[in-house]
Regions:
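N-terminal Rossmann-like FAD-binding beta1-loop-alpha1 element of flavoenzymes
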Residues: 10-36
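Glycine-rich FAD pyrophosphate-binding loop
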Residues: 28-51
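N-terminal glycine-rich dinucleotide-binding loop that anchors FAD/FMN and/or NAD(P) in oxidoreductases
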Residues: 51-76
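Central beta-strand plus flanking loop segment that forms part of the substrate or channel wall
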Residues: 61, 171-206, 222-226, 233-236, ...
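Conserved FAD/dinucleotide-binding core of flavoprotein oxidoreductases
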Residues: 211-273
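Short FAD-binding loop at a beta-strand-to-alpha-helix junction that anchors the flavin cofactor
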Residues: 283-299
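C-terminal helical "tail/cap" subdomain of flavin- and related membrane-associated enzymes
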Residues: 317-395
Length: 395
Protein backbone atom coordinates (compact mmCIF):
# COMPACT_ATOMS: atom_id res chain seq x y z
CA UNK A 1 0.00 0.00 0.00
CA UNK A 2 1.37 3.38 -0.99
CA UNK A 3 2.08 6.15 1.49
CA UNK A 4 -0.70 8.68 0.92
CA UNK A 5 1.46 11.51 -0.45
CA UNK A 6 0.04 11.70 -3.95
CA UNK A 7 -3.05 13.84 -4.30
CA UNK A 8 -4.20 12.92 -7.81
CA UNK A 9 -5.92 9.56 -8.22
CA UNK A 10 -7.88 7.61 -10.77
CA UNK A 11 -10.49 6.71 -8.16
CA UNK A 12 -11.15 7.96 -4.64
CA UNK A 13 -13.41 5.66 -2.60
CA UNK A 14 -15.19 7.22 0.38
CA UNK A 15 -15.79 4.35 2.79
CA UNK A 16 -13.35 1.65 3.87
CA UNK A 17 -15.88 -0.98 4.88
CA UNK A 18 -16.49 -4.30 3.20
CA UNK A 19 -17.79 -2.90 -0.09
CA UNK A 20 -15.27 -0.05 -0.36
CA UNK A 21 -12.31 -2.33 0.39
CA UNK A 22 -13.55 -4.89 -2.13
CA UNK A 23 -13.66 -2.24 -4.84
CA UNK A 24 -10.21 -0.96 -3.84
CA UNK A 25 -8.81 -4.51 -4.02
CA UNK A 26 -10.26 -5.19 -7.48
CA UNK A 27 -9.14 -1.84 -8.90
CA UNK A 28 -5.76 -2.00 -7.17
CA UNK A 29 -5.10 -5.42 -8.67
CA UNK A 30 -5.79 -3.80 -12.06
CA UNK A 31 -3.25 -1.03 -11.23
CA UNK A 32 -5.66 1.85 -10.95
CA UNK A 33 -4.37 4.58 -8.63
CA UNK A 34 -6.86 4.44 -5.76
CA UNK A 35 -7.34 6.24 -2.45
CA UNK A 36 -9.62 4.81 0.24
CA UNK A 37 -11.02 7.23 2.83
CA UNK A 38 -12.15 5.71 6.12
CA UNK A 39 -13.40 7.63 9.15
CA UNK A 40 -12.27 5.20 11.84
CA UNK A 41 -9.43 2.75 12.30
CA UNK A 42 -10.67 -0.83 12.41
CA UNK A 43 -9.97 -2.87 15.54
CA UNK A 44 -9.04 -6.40 14.53
CA UNK A 45 -7.65 -7.44 17.90
CA UNK A 46 -10.42 -9.67 19.17
CA UNK A 47 -10.46 -12.86 21.30
CA UNK A 48 -10.41 -15.87 18.99
CA UNK A 49 -13.39 -17.45 20.76
CA UNK A 50 -15.55 -14.35 20.21
CA UNK A 51 -17.98 -13.98 17.31
CA UNK A 52 -18.85 -10.75 15.53
CA UNK A 53 -22.59 -10.11 15.81
CA UNK A 54 -22.59 -8.87 12.22
CA UNK A 55 -22.48 -11.88 9.92
CA UNK A 56 -23.27 -12.28 6.23
CA UNK A 57 -24.46 -15.11 4.03
CA UNK A 58 -21.82 -14.95 1.29
CA UNK A 59 -22.93 -16.31 -2.08
CA UNK A 60 -20.77 -18.26 -4.47
CA UNK A 61 -20.50 -15.16 -6.68
CA UNK A 62 -19.24 -13.07 -3.75
CA UNK A 63 -16.82 -15.84 -2.81
CA UNK A 64 -15.45 -15.76 -6.37
CA UNK A 65 -14.78 -12.03 -6.01
CA UNK A 66 -12.87 -12.61 -2.77
CA UNK A 67 -10.90 -15.44 -4.36
CA UNK A 68 -10.10 -13.24 -7.35
CA UNK A 69 -8.39 -10.60 -5.21
CA UNK A 70 -6.61 -13.17 -3.03
CA UNK A 71 -8.60 -12.57 0.16
CA UNK A 72 -10.52 -15.83 0.47
CA UNK A 73 -7.74 -17.93 2.01
CA UNK A 74 -7.57 -15.59 5.02
CA UNK A 75 -11.34 -15.88 5.52
CA UNK A 76 -11.66 -19.61 5.04
CA UNK A 77 -10.78 -20.79 8.55
CA UNK A 78 -13.77 -18.90 9.99
CA UNK A 79 -16.13 -19.49 7.06
CA UNK A 80 -19.06 -21.81 7.78
CA UNK A 81 -20.31 -23.54 4.63
CA UNK A 82 -23.97 -24.44 4.45
CA UNK A 83 -25.23 -27.03 2.02
CA UNK A 84 -28.88 -26.90 2.97
CA UNK A 85 -31.53 -24.35 3.82
CA UNK A 86 -34.88 -25.07 5.44
CA UNK A 87 -37.70 -22.54 5.30
CA UNK A 88 -41.13 -22.96 6.84
CA UNK A 89 -44.21 -20.94 7.74
CA UNK A 90 -45.46 -20.56 11.30
CA UNK A 91 -48.98 -20.03 9.97
CA UNK A 92 -49.44 -23.45 8.37
CA UNK A 93 -47.69 -26.49 6.95
CA UNK A 94 -45.75 -24.76 4.17
CA UNK A 95 -42.17 -26.00 4.02
CA UNK A 96 -39.33 -25.89 1.51
CA UNK A 97 -35.95 -27.60 1.62
CA UNK A 98 -33.02 -26.42 -0.51
CA UNK A 99 -30.10 -28.83 -0.88
CA UNK A 100 -26.97 -28.00 -2.89
CA UNK A 101 -26.49 -31.73 -3.57
CA UNK A 102 -29.51 -31.55 -5.91
CA UNK A 103 -27.39 -29.26 -8.12
CA UNK A 104 -24.27 -31.38 -7.75
CA UNK A 105 -22.71 -28.53 -5.74
CA UNK A 106 -20.92 -28.93 -2.38
CA UNK A 107 -22.64 -25.96 -0.71
CA UNK A 108 -25.02 -23.04 -1.20
CA UNK A 109 -22.80 -20.42 0.41
CA UNK A 110 -20.86 -19.50 3.55
CA UNK A 111 -21.67 -17.59 6.72
CA UNK A 112 -18.88 -15.15 7.55
CA UNK A 113 -18.32 -12.48 10.17
CA UNK A 114 -18.08 -8.92 8.90
CA UNK A 115 -14.79 -8.23 10.66
CA UNK A 116 -13.18 -11.38 9.22
CA UNK A 117 -14.04 -10.24 5.70
CA UNK A 118 -12.85 -6.69 6.31
CA UNK A 119 -9.57 -7.81 7.89
CA UNK A 120 -8.77 -10.12 4.97
CA UNK A 121 -9.55 -7.39 2.43
CA UNK A 122 -7.48 -4.83 4.33
CA UNK A 123 -4.51 -7.20 4.31
CA UNK A 124 -4.82 -7.53 0.53
CA UNK A 125 -5.16 -3.78 0.00
CA UNK A 126 -2.13 -3.13 2.24
CA UNK A 127 0.06 -5.03 -0.24
CA UNK A 128 -1.10 -3.11 -3.32
CA UNK A 129 1.34 -0.30 -4.28
CA UNK A 130 -1.27 1.61 -6.27
CA UNK A 131 -3.72 1.88 -3.34
CA UNK A 132 -3.44 4.50 -0.57
CA UNK A 133 -5.45 4.27 2.64
CA UNK A 134 -6.24 7.54 4.40
CA UNK A 135 -7.51 6.95 7.92
CA UNK A 136 -9.00 8.76 9.67
CA UNK A 137 -10.32 10.79 6.76
CA UNK A 138 -13.76 12.21 6.08
CA UNK A 139 -15.09 14.05 3.03
CA UNK A 140 -16.00 17.63 3.86
CA UNK A 141 -16.91 18.83 0.37
CA UNK A 142 -16.16 18.19 -3.28
CA UNK A 143 -16.49 20.13 -6.49
CA UNK A 144 -16.35 19.13 -10.14
CA UNK A 145 -13.78 21.22 -11.99
CA UNK A 146 -12.75 20.21 -15.48
CA UNK A 147 -11.89 16.52 -15.67
CA UNK A 148 -11.51 15.97 -11.90
CA UNK A 149 -13.52 15.83 -8.72
CA UNK A 150 -11.67 18.07 -6.27
CA UNK A 151 -12.21 16.66 -2.79
CA UNK A 152 -11.66 18.54 0.45
CA UNK A 153 -11.23 16.47 3.60
CA UNK A 154 -12.27 17.65 7.05
CA UNK A 155 -8.63 17.84 8.17
CA UNK A 156 -7.86 20.28 5.35
CA UNK A 157 -6.18 17.89 2.93
CA UNK A 158 -7.18 18.06 -0.73
CA UNK A 159 -7.39 15.28 -3.32
CA UNK A 160 -8.32 15.10 -6.98
CA UNK A 161 -9.79 12.13 -8.81
CA UNK A 162 -11.19 11.18 -12.18
CA UNK A 163 -13.94 9.39 -10.24
CA UNK A 164 -15.30 9.68 -6.70
CA UNK A 165 -17.12 6.59 -5.40
CA UNK A 166 -19.49 6.75 -2.45
CA UNK A 167 -19.21 3.49 -0.51
CA UNK A 168 -20.02 5.22 2.75
CA UNK A 169 -23.21 3.46 3.77
CA UNK A 170 -26.89 4.22 4.06
CA UNK A 171 -26.29 7.73 5.43
CA UNK A 172 -23.81 8.47 2.65
CA UNK A 173 -22.19 11.90 2.90
CA UNK A 174 -21.10 11.60 -0.75
CA UNK A 175 -24.69 11.04 -1.86
CA UNK A 176 -25.84 13.99 0.23
CA UNK A 177 -23.14 16.36 -1.04
CA UNK A 178 -23.96 15.32 -4.61
CA UNK A 179 -27.61 16.26 -4.11
CA UNK A 180 -28.84 12.76 -4.94
CA UNK A 181 -32.13 12.10 -3.18
CA UNK A 182 -32.69 8.77 -1.44
CA UNK A 183 -36.22 7.51 -0.85
CA UNK A 184 -36.48 5.72 2.49
CA UNK A 185 -39.26 4.06 4.45
CA UNK A 186 -39.20 2.49 7.88
CA UNK A 187 -40.43 -1.09 8.15
CA UNK A 188 -41.46 -0.52 11.76
CA UNK A 189 -39.26 -3.49 12.61
CA UNK A 190 -35.91 -4.12 14.21
CA UNK A 191 -33.50 -7.01 13.73
CA UNK A 192 -32.35 -8.60 16.97
CA UNK A 193 -29.00 -10.33 16.50
CA UNK A 194 -27.09 -12.64 18.83
CA UNK A 195 -24.87 -15.71 18.85
CA UNK A 196 -26.38 -18.83 20.43
CA UNK A 197 -25.41 -22.37 21.33
CA UNK A 198 -28.01 -25.07 20.76
CA UNK A 199 -28.55 -28.59 22.07
CA UNK A 200 -28.12 -30.15 18.62
CA UNK A 201 -25.55 -29.22 15.93
CA UNK A 202 -26.64 -26.97 13.08
CA UNK A 203 -25.63 -29.62 10.51
CA UNK A 204 -24.30 -26.96 8.11
CA UNK A 205 -27.86 -25.86 7.48
CA UNK A 206 -29.38 -22.37 7.39
CA UNK A 207 -32.85 -22.20 8.91
CA UNK A 208 -35.61 -19.61 8.53
CA UNK A 209 -39.07 -19.59 10.03
CA UNK A 210 -41.62 -17.01 8.92
CA UNK A 211 -43.46 -15.70 11.97
CA UNK A 212 -46.40 -13.27 11.75
CA UNK A 213 -44.18 -10.64 13.40
CA UNK A 214 -41.22 -11.22 11.06
CA UNK A 215 -38.72 -13.88 9.97
CA UNK A 216 -36.41 -15.70 12.38
CA UNK A 217 -33.14 -17.07 10.96
CA UNK A 218 -30.55 -19.40 12.45
CA UNK A 219 -27.28 -19.23 10.51
CA UNK A 220 -24.48 -21.78 11.06
CA UNK A 221 -21.13 -20.58 12.38
CA UNK A 222 -17.71 -22.16 12.00
CA UNK A 223 -17.43 -23.19 15.67
CA UNK A 224 -20.78 -25.01 15.88
CA UNK A 225 -22.75 -22.09 17.28
CA UNK A 226 -25.42 -20.21 15.33
CA UNK A 227 -25.98 -16.56 14.57
CA UNK A 228 -29.62 -15.59 14.93
CA UNK A 229 -31.42 -12.74 13.21
CA UNK A 230 -34.90 -12.21 14.62
CA UNK A 231 -36.73 -9.51 12.67
CA UNK A 232 -39.69 -8.36 14.72
CA UNK A 233 -42.07 -5.47 15.16
CA UNK A 234 -40.30 -2.80 17.17
CA UNK A 235 -42.38 -3.27 20.34
CA UNK A 236 -41.74 -7.03 20.40
CA UNK A 237 -38.05 -6.53 19.66
CA UNK A 238 -37.72 -4.19 22.63
CA UNK A 239 -39.54 -6.66 24.90
CA UNK A 240 -37.19 -9.43 23.79
CA UNK A 241 -34.22 -7.23 24.63
CA UNK A 242 -35.57 -6.72 28.15
CA UNK A 243 -35.68 -10.46 28.92
CA UNK A 244 -32.86 -12.02 30.90
CA UNK A 245 -30.73 -14.58 29.06
CA UNK A 246 -32.62 -17.64 30.35
CA UNK A 247 -36.04 -16.25 29.40
CA UNK A 248 -34.76 -15.06 26.04
CA UNK A 249 -33.29 -18.48 25.22
CA UNK A 250 -36.60 -20.10 26.17
CA UNK A 251 -38.58 -17.68 23.98
CA UNK A 252 -36.16 -18.19 21.11
CA UNK A 253 -36.36 -21.98 21.31
CA UNK A 254 -40.16 -21.85 21.30
CA UNK A 255 -40.28 -19.44 18.35
CA UNK A 256 -37.91 -21.76 16.45
CA UNK A 257 -39.96 -24.87 17.32
CA UNK A 258 -36.87 -26.41 18.92
CA UNK A 259 -35.57 -27.51 15.52
CA UNK A 260 -32.07 -27.66 17.06
CA UNK A 261 -33.25 -28.62 20.52
CA UNK A 262 -33.00 -26.26 23.46
CA UNK A 263 -31.17 -22.95 23.11
CA UNK A 264 -28.53 -23.39 25.80
CA UNK A 265 -26.98 -19.93 25.99
CA UNK A 266 -26.66 -16.68 24.11
CA UNK A 267 -24.26 -13.79 23.69
CA UNK A 268 -25.09 -10.15 24.14
CA UNK A 269 -27.99 -9.00 21.98
CA UNK A 270 -28.22 -5.96 19.73
CA UNK A 271 -30.98 -4.28 17.79
CA UNK A 272 -30.71 -2.79 14.31
CA UNK A 273 -33.60 -0.76 12.84
CA UNK A 274 -34.89 -2.04 9.51
CA UNK A 275 -35.73 0.18 6.58
CA UNK A 276 -35.63 0.11 2.84
CA UNK A 277 -33.96 2.87 0.88
CA UNK A 278 -32.93 3.54 -2.67
CA UNK A 279 -31.09 6.38 -4.34
CA UNK A 280 -32.89 7.96 -7.27
CA UNK A 281 -29.60 8.00 -9.19
CA UNK A 282 -26.47 5.87 -8.85
CA UNK A 283 -24.22 8.12 -10.90
CA UNK A 284 -23.42 11.73 -11.73
CA UNK A 285 -20.50 13.21 -13.67
CA UNK A 286 -17.34 11.68 -12.10
CA UNK A 287 -19.33 10.15 -9.27
CA UNK A 288 -20.82 6.71 -8.53
CA UNK A 289 -22.57 5.10 -5.56
CA UNK A 290 -22.17 1.48 -4.48
CA UNK A 291 -23.58 -0.74 -1.74
CA UNK A 292 -25.78 0.75 0.97
CA UNK A 293 -25.07 4.25 -0.31
CA UNK A 294 -27.35 3.39 -3.24
CA UNK A 295 -29.71 0.72 -1.86
CA UNK A 296 -30.77 -0.88 1.43
CA UNK A 297 -33.03 -3.94 1.44
CA UNK A 298 -34.77 -6.01 4.11
CA UNK A 299 -32.37 -8.68 5.47
CA UNK A 300 -35.01 -11.38 4.93
CA UNK A 301 -32.98 -13.16 2.23
CA UNK A 302 -29.54 -12.07 3.42
CA UNK A 303 -28.79 -10.48 0.06
CA UNK A 304 -27.80 -6.94 1.09
CA UNK A 305 -24.02 -7.39 1.12
CA UNK A 306 -24.12 -9.60 -1.97
CA UNK A 307 -25.95 -6.88 -3.89
CA UNK A 308 -23.21 -4.46 -2.84
CA UNK A 309 -20.53 -6.85 -4.08
CA UNK A 310 -22.39 -7.18 -7.38
CA UNK A 311 -22.16 -3.39 -7.60
CA UNK A 312 -18.40 -3.68 -7.06
CA UNK A 313 -17.99 -6.29 -9.80
CA UNK A 314 -20.07 -4.32 -12.29
CA UNK A 315 -18.46 -0.94 -11.59
CA UNK A 316 -14.97 -2.44 -11.78
CA UNK A 317 -15.81 -4.16 -15.08
CA UNK A 318 -17.18 -0.87 -16.44
CA UNK A 319 -14.03 1.04 -15.49
CA UNK A 320 -11.72 -1.65 -16.86
CA UNK A 321 -13.56 -1.69 -20.17
CA UNK A 322 -13.45 2.11 -20.40
CA UNK A 323 -9.71 2.14 -19.74
CA UNK A 324 -9.07 -0.62 -22.28
CA UNK A 325 -11.00 1.40 -24.87
CA UNK A 326 -9.13 4.58 -23.86
CA UNK A 327 -12.30 6.24 -22.66
CA UNK A 328 -12.64 8.56 -19.67
CA UNK A 329 -13.55 6.47 -16.61
CA UNK A 330 -15.43 9.39 -15.06
CA UNK A 331 -17.56 10.23 -18.09
CA UNK A 332 -21.28 10.10 -17.40
CA UNK A 333 -21.93 7.96 -20.48
CA UNK A 334 -19.47 5.38 -19.14
CA UNK A 335 -20.92 5.41 -15.63
CA UNK A 336 -24.48 5.05 -16.88
CA UNK A 337 -23.59 1.59 -18.13
CA UNK A 338 -22.96 0.63 -14.51
CA UNK A 339 -26.21 2.26 -13.38
CA UNK A 340 -28.25 0.45 -16.04
CA UNK A 341 -26.72 -2.88 -15.09
CA UNK A 342 -27.30 -2.59 -11.35
CA UNK A 343 -30.25 -0.33 -10.62
CA UNK A 344 -32.93 -2.62 -12.03
CA UNK A 345 -31.53 -5.69 -10.29
CA UNK A 346 -31.33 -3.93 -6.93
CA UNK A 347 -34.84 -2.48 -7.21
CA UNK A 348 -36.23 -5.87 -8.21
CA UNK A 349 -34.69 -7.47 -5.12
CA UNK A 350 -36.10 -4.67 -2.97
CA UNK A 351 -39.64 -5.15 -4.27
CA UNK A 352 -39.39 -8.94 -3.96
CA UNK A 353 -38.31 -8.59 -0.33
CA UNK A 354 -41.17 -6.15 0.31
CA UNK A 355 -43.58 -8.62 -1.27
CA UNK A 356 -42.31 -11.48 0.88
CA UNK A 357 -42.58 -9.34 4.00
CA UNK A 358 -46.18 -8.42 3.23
CA UNK A 359 -47.14 -11.95 2.21
CA UNK A 360 -45.60 -13.75 5.17
CA UNK A 361 -46.60 -11.06 7.66
CA UNK A 362 -50.28 -11.37 6.77
CA UNK A 363 -52.69 -13.28 9.00
CA UNK A 364 -55.52 -13.15 6.45
CA UNK A 365 -56.68 -16.74 5.99
CA UNK A 366 -56.70 -16.86 2.15
CA UNK A 367 -53.16 -15.44 2.02
CA UNK A 368 -51.95 -17.90 4.66
CA UNK A 369 -53.40 -20.74 2.62
CA UNK A 370 -51.89 -19.42 -0.63
CA UNK A 371 -48.37 -18.94 0.73
CA UNK A 372 -48.30 -22.39 2.34
CA UNK A 373 -49.52 -23.94 -0.88
CA UNK A 374 -46.87 -21.98 -2.78
CA UNK A 375 -44.04 -23.19 -0.55
CA UNK A 376 -45.13 -26.79 -0.91
CA UNK A 377 -45.59 -26.51 -4.68
CA UNK A 378 -42.10 -25.05 -5.13
CA UNK A 379 -40.65 -27.77 -2.91
CA UNK A 380 -42.29 -30.36 -5.16
CA UNK A 381 -40.99 -28.76 -8.39
CA UNK A 382 -37.27 -29.66 -8.73
CA UNK A 383 -36.63 -27.56 -11.84
CA UNK A 384 -38.05 -24.39 -10.28
CA UNK A 385 -36.36 -25.04 -6.95
CA UNK A 386 -33.01 -25.56 -8.66
CA UNK A 387 -33.45 -22.31 -10.56
CA UNK A 388 -34.11 -20.46 -7.29
CA UNK A 389 -31.03 -22.04 -5.72
CA UNK A 390 -28.79 -21.05 -8.63
CA UNK A 391 -30.05 -17.47 -8.50
CA UNK A 392 -29.50 -17.30 -4.73
CA UNK A 393 -25.97 -18.69 -5.14
CA UNK A 394 -25.16 -16.11 -7.80
CA UNK A 395 -24.43 -18.79 -10.39
Amino acid sequence: MAVAKQVDFDVVIAGGGLVGLSLAAVLGKAEFKVAVLETRKADFDWPQDSIDLRVYAVTRASQALFMGVGAWSAMQTRAAPFGEMRVWDAGGNGDIHFDSAELGEPYLGHILESRVIEKALLEVVAELPSVSLLCPARVNAFELRGDRQHIELQDGRSLAAKLLVGADGKDSAVRGHAGIHARASDYGQQALVATVRTQHPHAETAWQRFLPTGPLAFLPLFDGRSSIVWSADSDLARRLMELDDADFCAALGEAFEYRLGEVLDCSERRLFPLRRQYAERYVAPRLALVGDASHVVHPLAGQGVNLGLKDVSELAATLLQARDRQRDIGALLVLRRYERARKGDNLAMMWVMDGFKQLFGSRVAPLCWARNLGLNLVDAAPALKNQIMRAAMGL
